């Protein structure tokens, strides 16, 4: 249709600068290539009438003659001379009215020169390939280089003398001949290649603009006729003497012929030629077309297009490091590029010139189009591309990979197919020219058929499948249009060809001399330059080709010329007989379209659903080639008559009659935009048995009955008589016996094949009445009959609005394998409807009185509800068509009524009531509404400003934002390009919104909330709030909504608005998750209904696809959700993601419910974050079906996490996507994260950044502006770009299972670069939500970079960021951890405390280096030293606890959401700490396995970062003696803590280090069986130890007797809220009184240095304990290291020596119990015997040396000494293996040290002597033994 070229008047369409350039390779060597010199015919239309135009903007203006008479009455003679000059050859004038007065001759000659400089521009550009020559000629004209202009009759000559500064010097003689306002030939002496040179242009412009300055003379023959004989002789002799050299030979030859006695031609012909008198009456007046130059230029252009083009990368990054776009994005670009890009540009510009020539009724249109067509068909590459693209299964063969290698040729192939389709569209318009004679139409038909055969021939030489020939539409749309008669369809007096013209036209064609060897008719199109020729002008404008060209019809057998009804010549029988009811049924005879024995012409065409090949059951059938083959998806269609009556013409003998919907009018578009991607419609039919895989019938190939083939009358009024189909697309049925009559007419050679290829043509006149009228309207508009076209389009527009197309999708069959819904018919109807709407808009908007109707048509098109397209190419085309309609709508001025309509639509969008079924979202409509209501600056000035109201902008904004939040109902796996298109439209709308409101942060937040789908659980980083979905199990029979319909909802999903009861209960969408919110507000769903949609529904309701979820996800959570609504920008930090989140794999199709997380279930080392698993929430995973998926069942039972920590079972909904390949990379449920979505949002982020002003990296080398204005990007937009980029990274991680192990990502480097540029705001956002987006090393690196900034706020934010990654210390290297600790220390002590706690917490799962932990311990000690003086009031707020034991500190933002308590969760078991005595019965404290069942208390901080107030720090036990509790649950009501009783050291059960008490990692959970077992605490005999707190808690009994004075501050332990104690099982517990009585007496006196200690501030004491605790953890980590043969294992001073000794000092400072605990830890962690010995000796020194033997008997100390002795034995054996003489001294010293170690135990010396004996027997040399013996002899301990 005309849509592509609708914007001609603005000059926007055909300059290639405005079209999309995907690669700039065409510019690389533009000047140097010979092919590039053509410049692609740019500039053939003036872009805008500016001061450069001589006409100032009148488009050429009239001639000087008109100007002279401005304001005067123009005489009738002048007016008549002008009309005669335009329409009638001067020779005819002379013959009809002899003699013509000379003055009248001069006036006719004066008006015969063209008046419009645009014509000169066009033909100059055509000849030269660009407008450069025209511009130079215009320059010469302005410089007054045209001298001595002279017009003699119809001949204009002058001398052009370029000024001295113009390079070519000298004068040029220019001559131009013209006739009937057309330049018919031109010549110049400059010798330029093209005839339309600069000088010719200068002369023409001079004649147009300075007509009065041209000397005007009568034709030479007129002047000669007035001379006497003497004057004639003088004239001849003077002429010869003036130019003797040039003229004399010719003059002598003419004299010889004249004087010859024989009958020479010059003597026998009457009269003589006169070049100045104009052409003869037999000559056709056509503009001079420089064909040879034009043909050469077209060849060069096509050659360059077909050849390989270089791909130029501007930098290495773009080639190697940038991520390749995913297939969906690549395919979208590949398919959109030919629609928008227009390549090759030169050919498209020529095609646009052809279209403009049609409009001007320039008879060169057809010759130019013919040259183009011939040249294109000579390139087999072009025909091969065209053929392959149009016959490929989905009409989109785009491989869609990177667009570099294969993608490049794909783009070229699609561009080529688009170009060829546009050519066919133009040929269709050429044959539909209302003024075309039937004879000429038949000639064109023959030529078109030959071209079709030529394409097929070229293809056969290639490697294409022969079986697809009939699928290839090629020229058939144009051939079908040849069978059309204006006289019958839509006669227009004075416009359409009438019988009075016919006789002249035929005589004319016979009279034309033909050029030998011409293969092409030059005058394919008769001239139609008069506005309305009258039937009574016989000699006026000859209609047939001129003398230079030969008719197309020569040598073609008449049988191939098509049906004869087009001609009135005798002997041609009409082949169309009237069927019942007036329907014409075309017998397949004429036009060679019959097929012997065929079931209606065996034309085949593949119809495919998107990218699907033929259905398998069709492929199993077989059928001979001539039988009727039906569409692949025929059986899935619904709504056709079950058994149509047999047609009288067809006996109905061959099985069931087949009936077909009307073909789409793919070729009726007037603009190249709407050429059909694959003009084949789907055939809906009950196919005959058997079908070859390739033989799918295309509908427009089938010789079918008229639109009224079912017996429908052709007129619209009679249409209701048949009720089989209620839309325009009627059913056709064919039979096998139609082709019998056609065989006799077959012509020889090749005719059979042609007959085969053209079998099934459907003549245009057999279409429905409205289709025929559309074709008429397009032809009228294309050929310049705008008033007639306008009248017709009004009628068509009203009909379209009154009878909208039916786009409902039929439900799939209830049974059988093929339950895939076919949307082929609906897709074709939709694309044709949009084509028609665009055409109607174009025509109607030309007249102000039709603007309202145009507006209604445009809105109708934008509101069209269609299903997803059946092929990828059509999906892209439909989206492009919508955008074109929107662009056309924006040009229409809107009045009050239109504005009220816009407000109404905006309201509906905002409220979500616009549509009830939307796989395709109305985003174009929303964009248009936004433009109209919110962005008045984008509207044309013609808009009615008075129609605005104050609330318009807010309404438009809310409607646009609501549209952004809509969600489609189709999955990316089934319709990837629809999802891609939806994303792109959303991105464009969001971009417009963000730019418009870039200074309004509240609006920007709303935009981003909808665009980034922050209410959806699937798309945001997995935080704890995601686990608390209240969805419950739904019926298992819920069907997947992947296609748009279900058995109970034929065609459309049932709307579930707040008012419609339907089968679902109110609130039934509560579990649907954050589905398409469509503007629904919270009031639509009662919050109190947490059940899911299908709960309690009847079974049929369960099968009904649910409507799009109309509630935001926070409502979907119901009242139990506890969802705190925190988005990315919220101040509180959401909790971290669970460990499995890192490996989300959204492509696993079977896990589609909330209860079946799509996670790869490999436990990551330590996970990335401590997840507070709470008490096993309902939906503990992110669902692949995501709770925002429409119609997918969010079936997650309220499973409870078991006591083992909520390890989740992989529950799969069986049979949900049966047979689907799990390795598919696109999600099978709507609105899921996908690779394509991630790519899109990254690109959007970069676009927003560019719109914000670009980042600094793009302007490194630009000079800073001196204006001092705003520097750098717009901050708000920059932040938006950052958030979008972060969101994209999150999506990317969702679909990249191994993202946590990445080492480099260009996306991450972009994010970090922007964060550095934005500053603290971006870092704050990252602190909130980096987990799920970045890996801990990436965050640590960014924090480190940011800490070096000058801005203190940024440094502070960098420290916060560093702190936030320390809980993942196991994923960081020591340098990163050290740097993060330094950053926190630089801020303040509180942050350092948090950092230390975070590292310790991370270390409990392993993976943190001991060196790091020692560093943390030193930091704690540094804090102790800072606060030892008691000045800790500043940190009171951070460490104080509320009465309930809940930490009220700064981590409140990290906790679980409030109110998550409840009685329904599993009890958490705490380790049993039963204390037993060996010989005496001691009361046992059993910390049992059941907890208080009271209501839980919500706590607002993360247990992971709580100060370590759990039991273990104060229990003097060895690191492994406490088991670790499962996930924290309820804090208990406060009660006195039980004391822990010391027992002898006989039992050493291997438990878990107490440090694990605070951990929440799922993998470190104690199973229930272990949790209930009793564990002993072996403690040396000493005073009772109570569980000590860090600070006082009111309301608790305080123990007054403590073992160490250091602890005497009267504080009670604040038990970690998650670590609750059970009731004490066992009644006789005297220790629970306020004055505990010692159970064991005879303890050691306290260490000397502690007996006199001063009272210490409890805060500093807390730091001291923490330092000790972390040091002990480091010791444990040392022991966990692999016991390999590393040299450091037995080193005298390994790296950790100083740290271990420092820790011993710390233990001694705390008390003897801590020293004993240290000894146990050291025995396990230290490997070096030398260090162990030093520890033993130093410990003995620190304890009182007087009681050394008592100490040595202590179990912990004894264990340490034994470990030291074992280490010496291992060391000696190790050294003996690798000993060399050089090492003897060292070895002897080691033996000496070992002896002193063995002396510490009674049995030690025996062991030592055994070692010596072994040494003596070893293979070492005697010398070594002698030295050892000597040393032992002199040894004195």
From Swiss-Prot:
Keywords: Cytoplasm, Metal-binding, Phosphoprotein, Ubl conjugation pathway, Zinc, Zinc-finger. Pathway: Protein modification; protein ubiquitination. Residues 55-65, 579-602, 1119-1130, 1447-1464 have a biased composition (Gly residues). One of its GO terms (biological process) is proteasome-mediated ubiquitin-dependent protein catabolic process. Residues 45-65, 514-727, 803-823, 1016-1232, 1442-1464, 1635-1656 are annotated as: Disordered. Residues 1019-1040, 1144-1159 have a biased composition (Polar residues). It is found in: Cytoplasm, Cytosol. The modification Phosphoserine is found at residues 36, 48, 53, 437, 567, 1153, 1156, 1160, 1267, 1836. Residues 523-532, 566-575, 1210-1226 have a biased composition (Basic and acidic residues). InterPro entries: Znf_SWIM, ZSWIM4-8_C. The modification Phosphothreonine is found at residue 1139. A zinc finger (SWIM-type) spans 172-208. Pfam families: ZSWIM4-8_C. Residues 1174-1209 have a biased composition (Low complexity). GO terms for cellular component: Cul2-RING ubiquitin ligase complex; Cul3-RING ubiquitin ligase complex; cytosol. One of its GO terms (molecular function) is ubiquitin-like ligase-substrate adaptor activity. The keyword Cytoplasm applies. Belongs to the ZSWIM8 family. Substrate recognition component of a SCF-like E3 ubiquitin-protein ligase complex that promotes target-directed microRNA degradation (TDMD), a process that mediates degradation of microRNAs (miRNAs). The SCF-like E3 ubiquitin-protein ligase complex acts by catalyzing ubiquitination and subsequent degradation of AGO proteins (AGO1, AGO2, AGO3 and/or AGO4), thereby exposing miRNAs for degradation. Specifically recognizes and binds AGO proteins when they are engaged with a TDMD target. Component of the SCF-like E3 ubiquitin-protein ligase complex which contains CUL3, RBX1, ELOB, ELOC and ZSWIM8. (Microbial infection) Interacts with Zika virus protein NS5; this interaction allows STAT2 binding and subsequent proteasomal degradation. This is Zinc finger SWIM domain-containing protein 8. The lineage of its organism: Eukaryota, Metazoa, Chordata, Craniata, Vertebrata.
């Amino acid at each position: 249709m005309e849509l592509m070229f609708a914007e001609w008047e603005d000059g926007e369409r055909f300059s290639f600068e405005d079209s999309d350039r995907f690669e700039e390779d065409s510019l690389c060597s533009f000047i140097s290539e010979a092919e590039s010199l053509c410049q692609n015919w740019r500039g053939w239309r003036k872009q805008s009438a500016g001061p450069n135009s001589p006409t100032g903007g009148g488009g050429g203006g009239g001639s000087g003659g008109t100007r002279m008479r401005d304001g005067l009455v123009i005489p009738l003679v002048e007016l008549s001379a002008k009309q005669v000059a335009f329409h009638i050859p001067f020779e005819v004038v002379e013959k009809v009215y002899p003699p013509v007065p000379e003055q009248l001759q001069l006036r006719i000659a004066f008006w015969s020169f063209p008046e419009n400089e645009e014509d000169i521009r066009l033909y100059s550009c055509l000849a030269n390939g660009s407008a450069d020559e025209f511009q130079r000629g215009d320059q010469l004209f302005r410089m007054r280089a045209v001298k001595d202009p002279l017009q003699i009759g119809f001949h204009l000559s002058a001398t052009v003398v370029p000024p001295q500064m113009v390079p070519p010097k000298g004068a040029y003689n220019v001559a131009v001949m013209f006739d009937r306002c057309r330049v018919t030939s031109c010549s110049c002496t400059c010798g330029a290649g093209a005839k339309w040179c600069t000088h010719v242009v200068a002369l023409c412009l001079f004649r147009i603009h300075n007509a009065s300055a041209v000397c005007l003379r009568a034709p030479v023959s007129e002047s000669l006729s007035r001379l006497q004989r003497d004057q004639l002789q003088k004239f001849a002799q003077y002429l010869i003497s003036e130019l003797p050299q040039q003229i004399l030979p010719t003059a002598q030859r003419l004299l010889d012929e004249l004087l010859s006695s024989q009958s020479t031609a010059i003597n026998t012909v009457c009269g003589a030629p006169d070049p100045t008198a104009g052409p003869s009456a037999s000559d056709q007046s056509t503009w001079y077309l420089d064909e040879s130059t034009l043909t050469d230029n077209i060849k060069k252009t096509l050659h360059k297009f077909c050849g390989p083009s270089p791909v130029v990368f501007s930098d290495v990054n773009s080639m190697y490091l940038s991520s390749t776009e995913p297939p969906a994005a690549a395919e979208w670009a590949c398919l959109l590029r030919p629609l928008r890009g227009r390549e090759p540009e030169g050919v498209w510009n020529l095609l646009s010139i052809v279209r403009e020539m049609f409009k001007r009724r320039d008879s060169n249109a057809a010759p130019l189009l013919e040259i183009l067509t011939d040249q294109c068909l000579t390139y087999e590459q072009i025909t091969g591309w065209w053929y392959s693209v149009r016959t490929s299964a989905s009409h989109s063969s785009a491989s869609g990979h990177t667009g570099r290698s294969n993608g490049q040729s794909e783009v070229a192939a699609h561009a080529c197919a688009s170009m060829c389709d546009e050519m066919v569209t133009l040929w269709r318009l050429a044959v539909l020219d209302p003024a075309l004679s039937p004879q000429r139409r038949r000639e064109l038909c023959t030529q078109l058929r030959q071209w079709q055969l030529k394409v097929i021939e070229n293809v056969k030489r290639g490697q294409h499948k022969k079986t697809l020939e009939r699928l290839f539409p090629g020229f058939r749309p144009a051939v079908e249009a040849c069978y059309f008669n204006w006289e019958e369809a839509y006669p227009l007096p004075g416009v359409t060809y009438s019988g009075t013209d016919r006789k002249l036209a035929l005589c004319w064609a016979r009279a034309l001399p033909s050029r030998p060897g011409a293969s092409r008719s030059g005058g394919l199109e008769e001239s139609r330059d008069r506005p309305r020729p009258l039937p009574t002008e016989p000699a006026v404008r000859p209609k047939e080709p001129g003398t230079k060209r030969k008719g197309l019809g020569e040598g073609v057998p008449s049988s191939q010329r098509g049906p004869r009804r087009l001609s009135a010549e005798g002997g041609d029988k009409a082949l169309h007989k009237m069927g019942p009811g007036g329907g014409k049924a075309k017998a397949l005879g004429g036009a060679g379209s019959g097929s012997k024995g065929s079931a209606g012409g065996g034309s085949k065409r593949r119809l495919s659903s998107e990218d699907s090949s033929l259905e398998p059951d069709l492929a199993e059938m077989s059928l001979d080639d001539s039988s009727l083959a039906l569409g692949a998806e025929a059986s899935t269609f619904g709504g056709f008559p079950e058994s149509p009556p047999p047609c009288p013409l067809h006996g109905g003998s061959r099985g069931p009659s087949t009936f077909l919907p009307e073909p789409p009018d793919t070729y009726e578009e007037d603009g190249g935009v709407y050429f059909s991607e694959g003009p084949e419609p789907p055939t809906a039919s009950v196919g005959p048995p058997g079908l070859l895989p390739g033989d799918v019938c295309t509908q427009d190939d089938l010789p079918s009955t008229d639109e009224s083939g079912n017996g429908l009358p052709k007129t619209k009024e009679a249409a209701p008589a048949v009720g089989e189909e209620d839309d325009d697309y009627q059913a056709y049925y064919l039979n096998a016996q139609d082709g019998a009559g056609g065989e006799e007419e077959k012509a020889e050679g090749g005719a059979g094949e042609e007959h085969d290829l053209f079998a099934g043509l459907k003549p245009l006149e057999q279409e429905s009445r409205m289709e025929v009228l559309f074709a008429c309207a397009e032809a009228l508009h294309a050929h310049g009959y705008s008033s007639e076209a306008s009248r017709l389009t009004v009628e068509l527009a009203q009909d379209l609005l009154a009878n909208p197309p039916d786009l409902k999708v039929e439900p799939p069959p209830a049974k059988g394998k093929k339950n895939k819904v076919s949307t082929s018919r609906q897709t074709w109807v939709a694309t044709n409807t949009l084509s028609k709407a665009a055409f109607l808009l174009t025509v109607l908007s030309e007249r102000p009185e039709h603007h309202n109707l145009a507006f209604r048509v445009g809105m109708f098109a934008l509101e069209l509800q269609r299903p997803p397209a059946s092929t990828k190419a059509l999906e892209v085309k439909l989206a492009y068509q919508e955008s074109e309609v929107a662009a056309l709508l924006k040009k229409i001025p809107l009045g009050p009524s239109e504005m009220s309509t816009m407000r109404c639509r905006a309201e509906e969008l905002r409220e979500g009531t616009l549509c009830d079924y939307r796989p395709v979202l109305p985003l174009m409509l929303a964009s248009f509404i936004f433009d109209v209501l919110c962005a008045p600056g984008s509207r044309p000035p013609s808009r009615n400003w008075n129609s605005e109201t104050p609330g318009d902008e807010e309404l438009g904004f809310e409607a646009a934002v609501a549209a952004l939040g809509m969600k489609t109902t189709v999955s990316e796996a089934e319709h990837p390009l629809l999802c891609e298109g939806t994303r792109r439209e959303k991105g464009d709308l969001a971009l417009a919104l963000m730019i418009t409101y870039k200074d309004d942060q509240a609006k920007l937040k709303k935009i981003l909330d909808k665009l980034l789908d922050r209410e959806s659980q699937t798309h945001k980083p997995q935080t704890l709030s995601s686990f608390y979905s209240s969805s419950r199990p739904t019926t298992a029979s819920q069907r997947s909504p992947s296609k748009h319909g279900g058995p109970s909802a034929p065609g459309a999903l049932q709307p579930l608005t707040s008012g419609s009861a339907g089968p679902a209960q109110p609130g039934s969408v509560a579990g649907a998750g954050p589905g398409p919110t469509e503007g629904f507000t919270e009031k639509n769903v009662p919050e109190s209904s947490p059940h899911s949609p299908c709960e309690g529904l009847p079974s049929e309701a369960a099968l009904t696809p649910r409507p799009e979820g109309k509630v935001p996800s926070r409502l979907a959570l119901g009242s139990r959700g506890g969802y705190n609504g925190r988005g990315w920008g919220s101040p509180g930090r959401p909790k971290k993601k669970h460990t499995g989140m890192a490996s989300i794999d959204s492509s696993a199709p079977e896990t589609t419910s909330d209860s079946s997380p799509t996670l790869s279930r490999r436990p990551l080392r330590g996970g990335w974050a401590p997840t507070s698993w709470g008490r096993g929430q309902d939906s503990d995973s992110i669902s692949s079906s995501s709770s925002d998926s429409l119609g997918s069942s969010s079936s997650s039972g309220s499973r409870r996490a078991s006591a083992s920590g909520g390890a989740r079972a992989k529950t799969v909904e069986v049979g949900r996507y049966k047979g689907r390949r799990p390795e598919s990379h696109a999600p099978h449920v709507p609105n899921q994260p996908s690779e394509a979505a991630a790519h899109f949002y990254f690109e959007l982020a970069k676009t927003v950044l560019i719109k914000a002003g670009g980042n600094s990296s793009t302007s490194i080398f630009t000079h800073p502006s001196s204006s001092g204005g705003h520097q750098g990007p717009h901050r708000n937009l920059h932040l938006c770009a950052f958030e979008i980029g972060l969101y994209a990274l999150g999506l990317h991680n969702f679909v990249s299972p191994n993202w946590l192990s990445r080492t480099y990502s260009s996306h991450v480097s972009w994010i970090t670069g922007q964060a550095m540029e934005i500053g603290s705001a971006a870092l704050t956002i990252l602190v909130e939500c980096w987990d799920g987006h970045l890996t801990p090393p990436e965050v640590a690196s960014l924090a480190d970079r940011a800490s070096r900034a000058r801005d203190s706020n940024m440094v502070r934010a960098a420290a916060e960021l560093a702190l936030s990654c320390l809980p993942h210390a196991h994923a960081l290297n020591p340098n990163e951890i050290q740097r993060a600790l330094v950053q926190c220390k630089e801020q303040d002590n509180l942050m350092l405390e948090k950092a230390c706690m975070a590292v310790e917490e991370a270390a409990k799962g392993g993976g943190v280096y001991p060196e790091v932990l020692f560093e943390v311990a030193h930091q704690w000690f540094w804090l102790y030293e800072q606060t030892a003086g008691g000045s800790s009031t500043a940190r009171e707020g951070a460490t104080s606890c509320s009465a309930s034991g809940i930490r009220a500190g700064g981590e409140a933002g990290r906790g679980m959401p409030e109110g998550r308590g409840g009685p329904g969760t599993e009890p958490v078991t705490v380790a049993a700490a039963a204390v037993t005595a060996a010989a005496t019965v001691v009361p046992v404290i059993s910390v049992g396995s059941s907890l208080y069942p009271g209501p839980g208390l919500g706590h607002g901080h993360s247990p992971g970062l709580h100060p370590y107030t759990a039991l273990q720090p104060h229990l003097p036990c060895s690191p492994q003696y406490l088991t670790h509790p499962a996930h924290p649950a309820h804090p208990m009501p406060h009660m006195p803590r039980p004391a822990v009783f010391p027992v002898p050291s006989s039992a050493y059960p291997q438990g878990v280090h107490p440090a694990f008490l605070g951990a929440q990692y799922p993998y470190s959970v104690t199973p229930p069986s272990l949790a209930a077992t009793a564990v002993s605490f072996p403690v040396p005999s000493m005073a009772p130890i109570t569980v000590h707190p860090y600070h006082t808690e009111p309301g608790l009994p305080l123990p007054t007797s403590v073992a160490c004075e250091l602890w005497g501050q009267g504080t009670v332990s604040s038990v970690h809220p998650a670590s609750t104690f059970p009731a004490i099982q066992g009644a006789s517990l005297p220790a629970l009184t306020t004055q505990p009585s010692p159970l064991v007496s005879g303890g050691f006196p306290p260490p000397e240095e502690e007996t006199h200690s001063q009272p210490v501030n409890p805060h500093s004491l807390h730091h001291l304990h923490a330092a000790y605790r972390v040091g002990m953890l480091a010791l444990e980590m040392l022991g966990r290291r692999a016991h390999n043969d590393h040299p450091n294992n037995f080193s005298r001073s390994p790296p950790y020596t100083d740290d271990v000794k420092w820790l011993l000092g710390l233990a001694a400072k705390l008390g003897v119990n801590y020293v004993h605990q240290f000894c146990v830890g050291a025995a396990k962690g230290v490997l070096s015997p030398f260090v162990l010995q030093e520890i033993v000796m130093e410990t003995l020194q620190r304890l009182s040396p007087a009681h050394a033997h008592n100490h040595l008997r202590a179990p912990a100390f004894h264990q340490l000494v034994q470990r030291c002795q074992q280490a010496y034995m291992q060391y000696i054996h190790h050294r003996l293996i690798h000993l060399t003489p050089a090492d003897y001294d060292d070895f002897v010293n080691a033996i000496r040290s070992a002896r002193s170690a063995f002396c510490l135990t009674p049995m030690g010396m025996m062991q030592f002597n055994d070692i010596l004996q072994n040494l003596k027997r070893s293979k070492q040399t005697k010398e070594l033994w002698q030295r050892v013996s000597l040393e032992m002899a002199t040894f004195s301990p």
